């Protein structure tokens, strides 16, 4: 049996329905059910033969209340995981990049090459020089919106790396941008393709726009800190490569690390955080502290169509249900696998969140575990 680490944060909420809003109770029995589900997930012998990750940290929120946050297993040799353990969060970074881009538009920043106010429909021709290959008569114009919704049709560089750069080595962001300018859109116009290219480019858009608007410092990392991290009250969230500090989960690799060097994953997968900070992020986003109502509506709108009932919004996958909508994203970078999801009830202010962080790559089933934890929170 795995050692269960840290302290559960248990809030007892009355079951009630007031003014159409639902509140859910959280009890010691529910906390025990969570422990049982996670212990089963982390069991050493799995039917598919997959090894469990050494550590898992989670946070569960109900209507903006943190009802459970704790860690399981070993963050590193001799150190138990907790809700404060810091992990690389991989593609959960895209949620922050999307919010920062929407915030920049709200602030009235202007496009560098035209001087027009930034908008979702601003074309890349108004931001970058030398992107003529991105815009041909046969292809729709690549815009901020098409990057956010992954419908730009630009190839995903982590699937097909540019020929002149080494996926196992470092690459400066300006050089990678120059290589991406040589690409041409492919595929059915406006079709969805999961794309780290899009979110790397969004980070470059933020920097280019801020530099042209004489913002100081222009770095997209500094802007995300000021516009998102600080506003959400996140104290252990930052970027890969910075001074790590205490409490980091040691990574466990199941494959040779690629795209792990700077600046491959800028904007798409270069952030670190912990479970309680990501709950704080979910809460700040859902309560309007990061972006305004219209931007939030755009973020959670049906963007690129992924499947019959699944879309990609802006930094989140969107699944429409009969009673609840699910906004979610997974993350997978060398040494870490993560998952963050928000469950929003139709025609109600009620929402739930589940965050799961692990310190091994190639981990499967976090989405299914999150579904089980949502069922516990809803009393199902």
Q: Language-model features: where?
A:
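Short clusters of small/polar residues that mark proteolytic maturation junctions
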Residues: 71-73, 241, 338, 358
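A short acidic/small-residue loop/turn micro-motif
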Residues: 74-77, 262, 361-362
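Structured C-terminal helix/loop/strand segments within mature extracytoplasmic catalytic/sensor domains
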Residues: 331-380
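Active-site-proximal loop and beta-strand segments within enzyme catalytic domains
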Residues: 50-54, 62, 76-196
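N-terminal leader/targeting segments and the immediately adjacent pre-domain N-terminus
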Residues: 1-87, 103-117, 149, 207-214, ...
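Short, surface-exposed loop or secondary-structure junction motifs
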Residues: 67, 135-334
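Hydrophobic (often cysteine-bearing) scaffold residues that line and stabilize catalytic clefts
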Residues: 30, 34, 89, 93, ...
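Short beta-strand scaffold segments in enzyme catalytic cores
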Residues: 57-60, 317, 340
């Amino acid at each position: 049996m795995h050692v269960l680490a840290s302290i559960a944060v248990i809030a007892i909420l009355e079951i009630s329905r007031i003014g159409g809003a639902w509140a859910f109770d959280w009890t010691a029995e529910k906390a025990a059910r969570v422990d049982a589900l996670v212990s089963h997930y982390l069991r050493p012998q799995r039917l598919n033969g997959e090894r469990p990750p050494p550590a898992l940290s989670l946070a569960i929120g109900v209507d903006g209340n943190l009802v459970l946050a704790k860690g399981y297993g070993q963050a590193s040799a001799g150190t138990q995981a907790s809700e404060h353990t810091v992990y690389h969060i991989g593609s959960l970074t895209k949620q922050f990049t999307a919010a920062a881009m929407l915030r920049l538009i709200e602030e009235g920043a202007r496009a560098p090459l035209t001087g027009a106010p930034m908008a979702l429909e601003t074309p890349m021709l108004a931001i970058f020089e030398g992107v003529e290959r991105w815009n041909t008569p046969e292809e729709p114009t690549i815009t901020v919106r098409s990057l956010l919704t992954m419908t730009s049709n630009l190839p995903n560089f982590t699937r097909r790396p540019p020929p002149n750069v080494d996926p196992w080595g470092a690459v400066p962001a300006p050089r990678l941008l120059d290589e991406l300018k040589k690409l041409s859109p492919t595929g059915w116009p406006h079709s969805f393709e999961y794309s780290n290219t899009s979110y790397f480019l969004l980070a470059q858009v933020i920097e280019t726009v801020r530099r042209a608007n004489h913002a100081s410092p222009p770095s997209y990392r500094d802007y995300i800190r000021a516009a998102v991290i600080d506003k959400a009250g996140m104290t252990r969230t930052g970027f890969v490569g910075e001074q790590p500090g205490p409490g980091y989960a040691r990574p466990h690799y199941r494959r040779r690390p690629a795209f792990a060097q700077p600046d491959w994953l800028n904007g798409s997968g270069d952030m670190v955080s912990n479970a309680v900070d990501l709950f704080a992020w979910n809460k700040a986003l859902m309560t309007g502290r990061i972006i305004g109502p219209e931007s939030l509506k755009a973020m959670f709108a049906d963007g690129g169509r992924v499947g019959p009932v699944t879309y990609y919004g802006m930094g989140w996958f969107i699944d429409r249900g009969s009673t609840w909508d699910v906004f979610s994203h997974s993350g997978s970078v060398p040494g870490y696998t993560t998952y963050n999801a928000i469950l929003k009830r139709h025609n109600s202010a009620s929402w739930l969140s589940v965050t799961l962080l692990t310190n091994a790559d190639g981990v499967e089933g976090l989405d299914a575990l999150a579904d089980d934890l949502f069922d516990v929170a809803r009393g199902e």
